[in-house]
Amino acid sequence: MSNKNKSYDYVIIGGGSAGSVLGNRLSEDKDKEVLVLEAGRSDYFWDLFIQMPAALMFPSGNKFYDWIYSTDEEPHMGGRKVAHARGKVLGGSSSINGMIYQRGNPMDYEGWAEPEGMETWDFAHCLPYFKKLEKTYGAAPYDKFRGHDGPIKLKRGPATNPLFQSFFDAGVEAGYHKTPDVNGFRQEGFGPFDSQVHRGRRMSASRAYLHPAMKRKNLTVETRAFVTEIHYEGRRATGVTYKKNGKLHTIDAKEVILSGGAFNTPQLLQLSGIGDSEFLKSKGIEPRVHLPGVGENFEDHLEVYIQHKCKEPVSLQPSLDIKRMPFIGLQWIFTRTGAAASNHFEGGGFVRSNNEVDYPNLMFHFLPIAVRYDGQKAAVAHGYQVHVGPMYSNSRGSLKIKSKDPFEKPSIRFNYLSTEEDKKEWVEAIRVARNILSQKAMDPFNGGEISPGPEVQTDEEILDWVRRDGETALHPSCSAKMGPASDPMAVVDPLTMKVHGMENLRVVDASAMPRTTNGNIHAPVLMLAEKAADIIRGRKPLEPQYIDYYKHGVHDENEGAIEVKPYAK
């Protein structure tokens, strides 16, 4: 053991998205000593695979960048195990993700605020924190929806490839709308996306928040520091033990904040005796606080790629030629421009698949190339694809430790496709996507569907394809959800971010989300952490901003969703 007498005001477990925000904001108080413990390595400036936007497919599945999690056999996916990439570097998954910045719909946060005690998490209270974190280069300076001076610098997708414009036009031909900013007044519709790319480099949470703060004398950031144990005296956390370079180090803490993400936070809680008492006893762990919601309510977004052959030589398919990659890479190294300087998810859309939902339940990412996330490209000279899937499925999963060993990965199951509603929306998702991709605007480029292929038509054929081909969109959340103490499944007090029943143990990360949002979740996690930082510091919260936002049937005549062939049970 070493560092036995070292004490900190705040120990933050996890240097990912939320941990980076907290490390910066909490260390703004110069009289507070802050320690961030990150189990992965540093996000080196020279590391092309995490700094180069177009290299995003390389870290996934690579043990140097990815913790390489997997679900158990998913019972409704034909027993498949679904791989889950989790960032193994400073910045966490913000250092290996797709860099897409989506706030979610304002009505997501109205849903968060519905339970008694959650009122301060509605859109009006969250909006100022979104604006605080953003520097939106694509927004007008007078835009009251967007932030202009925050640490996260956002690039509006130029979407200049002709395939993007044809896709947006196809959405209009199918009966939808265009929208200039899916993070602004109107999410519903088709248009350019914001990306966390600045001057040709990935804008991770660590780059935006942690690195600028590291010069502060009261902030310490330790990488390759794997937390093995949280120490307690009754209901109070007193410190942590972590392993680094083969040695154990124990430090004292006035407060411990879990920011390990939707996998590691519930795992550490269960290892600490916080969770379902009977389950913990079955693993030989003495229960400390009975909170059956720890590891439950687990949500994720599943997605598929609908791929098409492109008749015109306008796609990015040739850039996947291994002979061209060195030249593309050199251009990026010396100029930070070219094909490698974009994540290429420069546009897409949000729509409702049926009239039973109040706001978009489908998200489309359009890509002017036909390639899987693992880098496997379609066998065509030119292609394009749409990523699609239901955004607020009612399927719920769980995470459970397998033993008392902190190094053993937990048992994970999301129960994808486990409900009739989930299956219904999946069938609708594929039919809505096909309807858009078959519009006249796509005719100059549409060389035919590659995947799933024209032979997949019936409800069951579609669902069978999803079972075989569906992949995670890498948005796990809600496994230690916020909620009032009256909710037996709530884990975190929404007013303090403290674990129910504990005095100084807090949770700030995606696991605390009460339910997922209808898009990529990195932006909501940053917002949650910004808001939590003010709570932890005892600062007056930012004033809520009550401004109008788009609701279908209220702001235009679009009273219903576009009709597609209905799902038949």
Curated annotation (Swiss-Prot):
UniProt pathway annotation: Amine and polyamine biosynthesis; betaine biosynthesis via choline pathway; betaine aldehyde from choline (cytochrome c reductase route): step 1/1
The protein's required cofactors: FAD
Gene Ontology terms: cellular component: membrane
Active site: H475 (proton acceptor)
GO molecular function, one term: betaine-aldehyde dehydrogenase (NAD+) activity
UniProt xrefs under InterPro entries: BetA, FAD/NAD-bd_sf, GMC_OxRdtase, GMC_OxRdtase_N, GMC_OxRtase_C
PROSITE patterns (alphabetical): GMC_OXRED_1, GMC_OXRED_2
Residues that bind FAD: 9-38
Catalytic activity line of the entry: choline + A = betaine aldehyde + AH2; betaine aldehyde + NAD(+) + H2O = glycine betaine + NADH + 2 H(+)
Keywords (A to Z) from UniProt: FAD, Flavoprotein, NAD, Oxidoreductase
E.C. numbers: 1.1.99.1, 1.2.1.8
Biological process annotations from GO: glycine betaine biosynthetic process from choline
Domain of life: Bacteria
Cited HAMAP family: Choline_dehydrogen
Role summary: Involved in the biosynthesis of the osmoprotectant glycine betaine. Catalyzes the oxidation of choline to betaine aldehyde and betaine aldehyde to glycine betaine at the same rate.
Entry's family note: Belongs to the GMC oxidoreductase family.
Name listed for the protein in its UniProt record: Oxygen-dependent choline dehydrogenase
Originating organism: Staphylococcus aureus (strain MW2)
